[in-house]
C-alpha cells in the first residue's frame, strides 16, 4: 500500500491529513494531522465516526453527500465545507495525484537530442 500527505481548504483553516491506500488505491485509513476548524462542528472531522466513513472507498466514491449514503461519504451535519475539504480536496485529490505519479513510474523522460 501507499500513504500520501494531502490537504484541503476547510471553513476556517487548511486541513492537513495522511491518506493510506492499498495497491488498488482503495482508502484504508485517513488521519488528520492539523486543522483549526470550528469547535463542535468542523472539528468533528477528526472523530472516528467520520474517519471510518472513508474505509474501503475508491476515488470515485470520495464524494460528500448530505444525508444517508452507503457508497459515498456522508457530510457532518453543520460542517459540509469541512467534510468536503477532507473528502474531495484532501482524500480524493491526494489519491488521484498519487495514482498519477505512480502510473508514470519507471517511464523515462526524453528531451530534445543535441
Each language-model region and where it sits:
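Flexible, solvent-exposed loop/hinge segments and secondary-structure transition points
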Residues: 1-114
Amino acid at each position: 500500500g501507499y500513504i500520501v500527505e494531502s490537504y484541503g481548504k476547510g471553513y476556517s483553516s487548511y486541513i492537513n491529513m495522511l491518506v493510506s491506500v492499498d495497491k488498488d488505491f482503495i482508502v484504508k485509513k485517513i488521519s488528520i494531522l492539523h486543522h483549526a476548524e470550528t469547535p463542535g462542528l468542523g472539528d468533528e472531522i477528526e472523530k472516528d465516526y467520520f474517519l471510518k466513513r472513508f474505509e474501503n472507498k475508491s476515488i470515485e466514491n470520495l464524494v460528500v453527500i448530505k444525508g444517508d449514503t452507503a457508497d459515498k461519504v456522508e457530510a457532518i451535519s453543520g460542517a459540509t465545507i469541512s467534510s468536503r475539504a477532507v473528502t474531495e480536496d484532501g482524500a480524493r485529490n491526494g489519491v488521484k495525484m498519487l495514482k498519477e505519479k505512480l502510473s508514470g513510474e519507471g517511464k523515462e523522460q526524453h528531451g530534445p537530442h543535441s
